[in-house]
Every structure is written in C-alpha cells, then in structure tokens.
From Swiss-Prot:
Localization: Mitochondrion inner membrane
Major location category of this protein: mitochondrion
Keywords: Electron transport, Membrane, Mitochondrion, Mitochondrion inner membrane, NAD, Respiratory chain, Translocase, Transmembrane, Transmembrane helix, Transport, Ubiquinone
Membrane topology of the entry: Multi-pass membrane protein
A GO CC term assigned to this protein in UniProt: mitochondrial inner membrane
Coiled-coil annotated residue ranges, if any: none
Organism the protein comes from: Pan paniscus
TM region(s), chain numbering: 22-42, 60-80, 94-112, 113-133, 145-165, 196-216, 224-244, 257-277, 284-303, 308-330, 351-371, 391-411
UniProt gene name: MT-ND4
NCBIfam families, alphabetized: NDH_I_M (TIGR01972)
Name of the molecule in the record: NADH-ubiquinone oxidoreductase chain 4
Functional description taken from the UniProt entry: Core subunit of the mitochondrial membrane respiratory chain NADH dehydrogenase (Complex I) which catalyzes electron transfer from NADH through the respiratory chain, using ubiquinone as an electron acceptor. Essential for the catalytic activity and assembly of complex I.
Length: 459
C-alpha cells in the first residue's frame, strides 16, 4: 500500500515548490501517473487480504474503490482550473493541498485494517472537505451547508466510536480480518440491536439513507466543482464500504435489523427520484439523483447475499463516475451562463454541439442504458431484490422509470429549446473540458467489457 500512499503524500511538496506557471501541469501529470498504481492491486492471486503491512492492505472490495479515488484526483484538478483562474498562486496551492490531503485520507480509510484506524481516517476526510466547501464555494449559503455537513456527519459517527470502544473491550481486537474470522453470532437482544444501530448509523448518514440525506443537496449545491466531484464520486462510497465491511461481522443480527432500513431505502429511492422531476436547480437535481442511486446500494448491502454485494460494488463505481461527470457538465454550463437554473441555460445544443453530445451520453449512463457498467450494477441489484421479495420489483421498476424521466428532463431542458436573451457571448468548449468528459466516460464503457475486476468479494 505504501507504493500508493507515499507518492500521493509527495504531491504536497510538489504543489508548493512548483513555479507559478507549472502548478497545474505538474500536479495533473503526477496525479495521473499515481492513478495507474492501483492497477497493480487488481492482479491478486486469490480473494484473501493482500497485506503489505499489518495496518494497510487491499482486497477485491478495496481495490476498485482505491482505483476510483486515485483516478478522480487528476480529474478534479483539471476541472478546477477555470474556477481558480483569478486566485493568487498561494490560494491555488492551498486548494490543491486540500484535494491531495483528502485523497491521502481516503486511500488510508479504504485500506485500513484496524477499525479504530479506519474511524480516525473516516473522520479526517471531513476536514479538507469542509474547508473546500466553506472557503471556495460560490454563494454565502456555503457556510450553512458546511454546518449541516459537519453536524450530520459528527452526530452520526459518535455512536460508532462508542461501539468500537465497547467491541475492543469485549473482544480485545479491532482487526477486520480477525473479527471476520472469529466473530461470535450476535443474539437478538436490545443491547446488541443498539450496537448494530451505532455501527451502521455513521455509514447510513454518509451514504446517505433517505431521511438522513438533508446535508447532501446543500453540500453539493454550495461546493465548488472539485468538492462536488469528490463528494459524489468517493465520499458517499465510504458509507457503502463501511457497511459492507461491518455488516458481515455483525451477522446474523443484520438480517433481523435490516427490514425497516430496507423499506426506508426503497421508499426513499422513489421519493428522491420524484423530487428530481420538480427541480429547477441543475446541481440540486444531480444531488437528489445521487441519493436515489445510493438508496439502491443500501438495499443491495442489507440483503446480504454475494450477488447483492457484487451489484452494490459495481453500482458504487458506476455511480461515482457518472455523477462526477454530470457535475463537470453542470459546472461547464455554470462557467458560461453563471446560473444553475436549468431553464436559463436552455438551447445550448446550438452553441456547443460537442458538449450536447457529452450531455446525451451522461444522461444515458445515468439512466443505466447498455453498454454502460451502470446497467450491470442495477440488474444485479434488481435480480437480488426480486429473489429476496417479489414486491420489490414494483418499487425498483417504478424507480427505473422515474430515473429515465428525470435524466431525459435534465437533458432536454438544458440542451433543447430557444436560447435565452442573456446568452450573448458564449465561449466554445475547451479541449480540457472535452478531455475531462472523455476520461469520465471511457471507464464507464470499458468496464462493461471486463466487469470481473470490480465485482468485489464474490469475483
């Protein structure tokens, strides 16, 4: 793991010692080189933990998420160039340092083998994210969004710390591998039920589960482009990863406790999809779309079958790339029209035909059209939920219909129609932007050729 962690840490001195003209080139190039390192972890002999040390290791569940995290840093740096064009060099370097430190803490969270280490890095991701949202957001409401983000995350994760201390006192170890191998069957008592809630609540807030999701649209809407991309693509996946790791240890209690949360996530999936149809703010629509997709992941994880876990991992990777792509496209609109209101950016297809092509592909990926990897993830979850209970087919099928509706609504509102009067001097799409969209879309399409590498434990 150190061969990934140390080069990422070395990006910090590189950023601060780079010349004014070379900041973007140096950081983008080196982070792109670093993003190839997780490819080494894919070639593992078997499904056991591939340990390089006692503290950090990777396995088939961790590796796809590490790859996603590493791949996203150069993309966020590329996307932020226009946003920071008027900032002095010291501020640019500080912004990049925040992104790099966030990447370091994410890599360490995904690869930590000790649960207390996992908890520390899980909380550490909060600091750079909060700084990015509250310092570099566009509107004054960003402070309110930062408060929501901090409050929800901290309140959700304090019970997790108490549960971890309790487990350590009882069992004497918090090593994930040891706990998985030596876990006792937990009986269905009040104390154990509360412990299960304490363990999973932090991750349900992070996913977020419907009802605990109010911080997400606020944070997404107020965050700068890099904040939105990292938040949608990787930070939400921390919740899914934590749930997959810990619900296995807490079995068979998970099977008893899962029912209310399964019902809530299935209900929330339809509710948030329906909310998307009524949105006027483009970033808010994409944020609610994220909640809807992650509700499907919660459902898959709580069903607790190998196939559902596979579907959850594939869906997390697919959603990470798709939602990040949609935020990039929304940002390219915002940089030209200076508004997030969809109706004010209508008719852009006539001015930016290539950007309209990326919008079409992103919308189709969002509604899980073949040959994207999204389809495979949704089908796996759909089949699993159907085998768990036949009635879920009605809910998931209805959700897929609404997803198709709001994806097409988003595309038609922003691209079709007559141009508004305030758009008089529109800059053409830059090579940087087109490269950015291509780098998001190519993994979505290429992974469908060999989805084996991101199917998690069950490959």
């Amino acid at each position: 793991m150190l061969k990934l962690i140390i080069p990422t840490i070395m990006l910090l001195p590189l950023t601060w010692f780079s010349k004014k003209r070379m900041i973007w080139i140096n950081t983008t190039t080196h982070s792109l080189i670093i993003s190839t390192i997780p490819l080494l972890f894919f070639n593992q002999i078997n499904n056991n933990l591939f340990s390089c040390s006692l503290s950090f290791s990777s396995d088939p569940l961790t590796t796809p998420l590490l790859m996603l995290t590493a791949w996203l840093l150069p993309l966020t740096i590329m996307a932020s160039q226009r946003h920071l064009s008027n900032e002095p060099p010291s501020r640019k370097k500080l912004y990049l340092s925040m992104l790099i430190s966030l990447q370091i803490s994410l890599i360490m969270t995904f690869s930590a083998t000790e649960l207390i280490m996992f908890y520390i890095f899980f909380e550490t991701t909060l600091i750079p994210t909060l700084a990015i949202i509250t310092r570099w957001g566009n509107q004054p409401e960003r402070l309110n969004a930062g408060t929501y983000f901090l409050f929800y995350t901290l309140v959700g994760s304090l019970p997790l710390l108490i549960a971890l201390i309790y487990t350590h006192n009882t069992l004497g170890s918090l090593n994930i591998l040891l706990l998985t191998l030596t876990a006792q069957e937990l009986s269905n008592t009040w104390a154990n039920n509360l412990m299960w809630l304490a363990y999973t609540m932090a991750f349900m807030v992070k996913m977020p589960l419907y009802g605990l999701h109010l911080w997400l649209p606020k944070a997404h809407v107020e965050a700068p482009i890099a904040g939105s991309m990292v938040l949608a693509a990787v930070l939400l996946k921390l919740g899914g990863y934590g749930m997959m790791r810990l619900t296995l240890i807490l079995n068979p209690l998970t099977k008893h406790m899962a029912y209310p949360f399964l019902m809530l996530s299935l209900w929330g999936m339809i509710m948030t999809s329906s909310i998307c149809l009524r949105q006027t703010d483009l970033k808010s629509l994409i944020a609610y779309s994220s909640v809807s997709h992650m509700a499907l992941v919660v459902t898959a994880i709580l069903i607790q079958t190998p196939w559902s876990f596979t579907g959850a991992v594939i869906l997390m990777i697919a959603h990470g790339l798709t939602s990040s792509l949609l935020f990039c496209l929304a940002n390219s609109n915002y940089e030209r029209t200076h508004s997030r209101i969809m109706i004010l950016s209508q008719g852009l297809q006539t001015l930016l035909p290539l950007m309209a092509f990326w919008w079409l592909l992103a919308s189709l990926a969002n509604l899980a059209l073949p040959p994207t990897i999204n389809l495979l993830g949704e089908l796996s979850v759909l089949v699993t939920s159907f085998s768990w209970s036949n009635t879920t087919l009605l809910l998931t099928g209805f959700n897929m219909l609404i997803t198709a509706l709001y994806s097409l609504y988003m595309f038609t509102t922003t691209q079709w129609g007559s141009l508004t009067h305030h758009i008089n001097n529109m800059k053409p799409s830059f090579t940087r932007e087109n490269t950015l969209m291509f780098m998001h879309l190519s993994p979505i399409l290429l992974l469908s050729l060999n989805p084996d590498i991101i199917t998690g434990f069950t490959s």
